[in-house]
């Protein structure tokens, strides 16, 4: 890969970063991570560098720049370029440049590794030019005052991050919502395969998004999905933008869905989502140890078995899905469903593994018996009607009896067994006698 590193001679932070990159490249004999680099120096502000890459024979452009803020804090940032509205800071109105989500994420993660003490690392939303670019590009910046712009420690950190960025398994996304420093998108990119290209902020940019701009975000980011920070975006805007994404055929992923992608290839994940949609239009899917290729199928558990296991310990149940090569499904409100997705070749074993998991959780919490292929769950619960028939008034005595404690009322000892009712649930599980 050939990379152009562009800075302005009038930008002290850009000069600082270039100097440290040159030092690092001297140590690495001119290349790093299989990439070769070409330095390009321009005059004036980089935000006005329209067409600067038109004659460059490269695959990627990285702008080395300073970052300024009305509330200055030491920060290292990356972001794509473009304008959702007026071109107040270079470029053209309502125009987005080609982004480089995978390299942006890799650089962000490398910045986090090398970040000096006292600095923080984040994306920024798309907010300035240049827009007239031919190659995928992004800015990497040191902020936010001259003290940081000339800081050799920050300059070295950015240099090592640019050269050490190593994209792997990135899933390119667009981000909608949040503040200027895109906190949720930053957290997602640092903890998952989610790699953002263009990002729009809640306060100034989301209201500007129409079909044309959303489509431009997707195309210029080469995004396969979108993330909406629902806590930061007004409900009306969420609905409006969601409708646009539906028209464009772009899926929306929640933060949990992105962080649970695991190592599954994106096309396989799309197939998982397609199977989930046959269960219900808003069904969510959560990937566990599912990876590889092959035909995917839905497998189903007995809904009563799953319900009983959930009631016993839902947290442990979901946690123990982790090592299994499955995706579990849930409603939009995160209610666990009895359908799972697995590779067809594993489906019989997966059903047995899931049955075994549920049975173990139930046996750990309930009184059970095995009768041939039936799991029998016996429960004894407090019956308020029986207590009333014995004259026990509602109140503390009810709570004691429900807790399995005898009470004295009107000269008689009333034991829990006198005010209890026994129930029995029978669940047919083929091969149960062989389960451990």
Curated annotation (Swiss-Prot):
Cofactor note: Binds 2 Zn(2+) ions per subunit.
Co-factor requirement: Zn(2+)
GO biological process: D-amino acid catabolic process
Key words of the record: Hydrolase, Metal-binding, Zinc
GO molecular function: D-aminoacyl-tRNA deacylase activity; zinc ion binding
Catalytic activity: a D-aminoacyl-tRNA + H2O = a tRNA + a D-alpha-amino acid + H(+); glycyl-tRNA(Ala) + H2O = tRNA(Ala) + glycine + H(+)
Transmembrane segments: none
Family: Belongs to the DtdA deacylase family.
Quaternary assembly: Monomer.
Protein name: D-aminoacyl-tRNA deacylase
Organism: Methanoregula boonei (strain DSM 21154 / JCM 14090 / 6A8)
Lineage: Archaea, Methanobacteriati, Methanobacteriota, Stenosarchaea group, Methanomicrobia
Gene that encodes the chain: dtdA
């Amino acid at each position: 890969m050939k990379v152009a590193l562009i800075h302005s001679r009038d930008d002290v932070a850009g000069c600082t970063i270039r100097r440290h990159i040159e030092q690092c490249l001297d140590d690495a004999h001119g290349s790093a991570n299989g990439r070769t680099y070409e330095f390009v120096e321009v005059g004036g502000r980089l935000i006005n560098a329209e067409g600067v890459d038109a004659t460059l024979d490269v695959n990627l452009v990285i702008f080395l720049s300073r970052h300024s803020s009305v509330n200055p804090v030491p920060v290292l940032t990356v972001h794509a370029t473009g304008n959702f509205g007026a071109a107040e800071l270079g470029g053209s109105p309502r125009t987005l440049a080609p982004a480089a989500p995978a390299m942006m994420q890799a650089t962000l993660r490398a910045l986090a590794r090398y970040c000096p003490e006292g600095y923080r690392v984040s994306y920024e939303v798309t907010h300035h030019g240049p827009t007239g670019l031919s190659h995928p590009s992004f800015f990497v910046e040191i902020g936010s005052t001259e003290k940081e712009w000339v800081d050799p420690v920050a300059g070295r950190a950015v240099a090592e991050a640019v050269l050490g960025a190593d994209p792997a398994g990135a899933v390119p996304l667009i981000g909608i919502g949040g503040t200027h420093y895109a906190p949720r998108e930053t957290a997602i990119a640092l903890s998952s395969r989610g790699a953002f290209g263009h990002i729009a902020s809640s306060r100034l940019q989301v209201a500007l998004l129409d079909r044309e701009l959303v489509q431009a975000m997707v195309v210029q980011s080469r995004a396969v999905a979108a993330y909406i920070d629902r806590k930061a975006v007004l409900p009306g805007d969420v609905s409006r933008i969601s409708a646009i994404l539906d028209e464009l055929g772009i899926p929306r992923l929640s933060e949990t869905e992105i962080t649970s992608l695991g190592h599954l290839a994106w096309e396989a994940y799309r197939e998982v989502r397609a199977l989930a949609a046959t269960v219900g239009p808003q069904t969510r899917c959560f990937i566990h140890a599912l990876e590889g290729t092959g035909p995917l199928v839905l497998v189903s558990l007995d809904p009563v078995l799953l319900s009983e296991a959930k009631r016993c310990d839902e947290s442990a149940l979901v946690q123990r899905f982790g090592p299994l090569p499955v995706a579990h499904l849930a409603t939009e409100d995160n209610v666990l469903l009895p359908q799972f997705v697995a590779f067809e070749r594993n489906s019989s074993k997966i059903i047995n593994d899931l049955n075994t998991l549920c049975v173990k959780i139930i046996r750990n919490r309930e009184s059970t018996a095995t009768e041939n292929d039936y799991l029998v769950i016996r429960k004894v619960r407090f019956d308020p009607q029986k207590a009333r028939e014995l004259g026990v008034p509602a109140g503390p005595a009810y709570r004691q009896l429900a807790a399995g404690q005898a009470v004295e009322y009107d000269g008689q000892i009333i034991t829990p067994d006198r005010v209890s009712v026994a129930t029995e649930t029978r669940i047919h599980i083929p091969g149960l006698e062989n389960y451990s």
